[in-house]
Amino acid sequence: MSGGLLKALRSDSYVELSEYRDQHFRGDNEEQEKLLKKSCTLYVGNLSFYTTEEQIYELFSKSGDIKKIIMGLDKMKKTACGFCFVEYYSRADAENAMRYINGTRLDDRIIRTDWDAGFKEGRQYGRGRSGGQVRDEYREDYDAGRGGYGKLAQKQ
């Protein structure tokens, strides 16, 4: 049974795919595009390192029934590193999350959602050299919600 608050807002409109494509996708662009168009999985980015799985669930379950949440982890420290994947049971529920949750605030951060071709084991780890996300390696500004200064800026 779905208690999704946003289910009532459902429409027949289609949520467009963004220009972003996973550079590590194993397959060609056509195959990735096909998977993205039928996917029930969202990539959620710009999370605080302190955002919990429970907070993600509370927000994203307003769009429908969630099958699984996979928190992004620093591959060295195994701590949260600012992203996650949210998998819904239905495409319609995932579309509602894209429509209504993308660009909202969570933990004082504007989060972004994007379609994902489907979670595969190993993708929960950051791809940066230090184990976190690549963007956090090069950031020169101070961001308390994402561990302070970027990793490379800290070394200087």
Curated annotation (Swiss-Prot):
Q: Which residues carry this modification: Phosphoserine?
A: 13, 18
Kindly list the positions at which N-acetylserine occurs in this protein: 2
State a single Gene Ontology molecular function: RNA 7-methylguanosine cap binding
Instruction: Please state every residue range assigned to the domain named RRM.
Output: 40-118
Q: Name one GO cellular component term.
A: cytoplasm
Return the annotated region ranges for Disordered: 124-156
Protein's cellular compartments: Nucleus; Cytoplasm
Q: What is its main location?
A: nucleus
Q: Which residues does the record give as mRNA binding sites?
A: 20, 43, 112-116, 123-127, 133-134
State the superkingdom. Eukaryota
* Assembly, per entry: Component of the nuclear cap-binding complex (CBC), a heterodimer composed of NCBP1/CBP80 and NCBP2/CBP20 that interacts with m7GpppG-capped RNA. Found in a U snRNA export complex with PHAX/RNUXA, NCBP1/CBP80, NCBP2/CBP20, RAN, XPO1 and m7G-capped RNA. Interacts with PHAX/RNUXA, EIF4G1, HNRNPF, HNRNPH1 and ALYREF/THOC4/ALY. Interacts with SRRT/ARS2 and KPNA3.
Purpose of the protein:
Component of the cap-binding complex (CBC), which binds co-transcriptionally to the 5' cap of pre-mRNAs and is involved in various processes such as pre-mRNA splicing, translation regulation, nonsense-mediated mRNA decay, RNA-mediated gene silencing (RNAi) by microRNAs (miRNAs) and mRNA export. The CBC complex is involved in mRNA export from the nucleus via its interaction with ALYREF/THOC4/ALY, leading to the recruitment of the mRNA export machinery to the 5' end of mRNA and to mRNA export in a 5' to 3' direction through the nuclear pore.
| Family per record | Belongs to the RRM NCBP2 family.
Protein name stated in the entry:
Nuclear cap-binding protein subunit 2
- Protein's organism: Mus musculus
Gene label:
Ncbp2
